[in-house]
Structures are given as C-alpha cells and as structure tokens.
Amino acid sequence: MAAQVNGDDNDRQITLIDDQGNEELYEVLFTFHSDDYDKSYVLLYPAAVGDDEDIEVQAFSYDADDTGDVTSSDLHEIESDDEWNMVQGVLNTFLDDDRLSGK
C-alpha cells in the first residue's frame, strides 16, 4: 500500500493508493510504537466521513522517520492475528479513555 503524507503534525492526512491506482484521503487517528513487535503503527479513518457516521478504522505498521513520524514510505499490512489483537487492544483503550479520544 502506497501512501502520501500531507499537512503538519496537528492535521495529518494520508492518501492511500490501492493496487488499481485509486486514491482515498484518510486522517491520522493516532500513531504508536509497540516494543513487543518493535514496530510503529498508524490508525487511519476516511477523511470524508461525517460526524454522525460510523467509521471504519484501518491500521498499518510503518517505517518511522528519525522523529517517529509517519513518512511517505510504504505502509505495511498487519498479517498476524496476534499483532491484530494487540492493535485492536490499543484502539479499544484509546476509544474507552475520554482523555485520549477527546470525548
């Protein structure tokens, strides 16, 4: 999956480009690093989603730059069930904690 990063640290957007060359703009929900997997992860949601719509969050691992940020490098699909379970647990913690999710 190819990606292009636009914006600054407060308003990061990523354009995902699928195998057919279709582009879709996503907002960065948050990023984190897992010491267990020694990888950085980014969670994204579609930029065009309305406030009252359910959103589908997508997660990828990525190669962080020197400051730990998402770069324009390729995103990597998460392939193992254990890794998906870890990412889902982090997302659930984020969504359940009002201080983190901004509820």
UniProtKB/Swiss-Prot annotation:
Residues that span the membrane, as ranges: none
Superkingdom per UniProt: Bacteria
Cited InterPro entries: UPF0473 (IPR009711)
Pfam families assigned: DUF1292
SS bonds (residue pairs): none
Entry's family note: Belongs to the UPF0473 family.
Protein name as it appears in the record: UPF0473 protein LBA0420
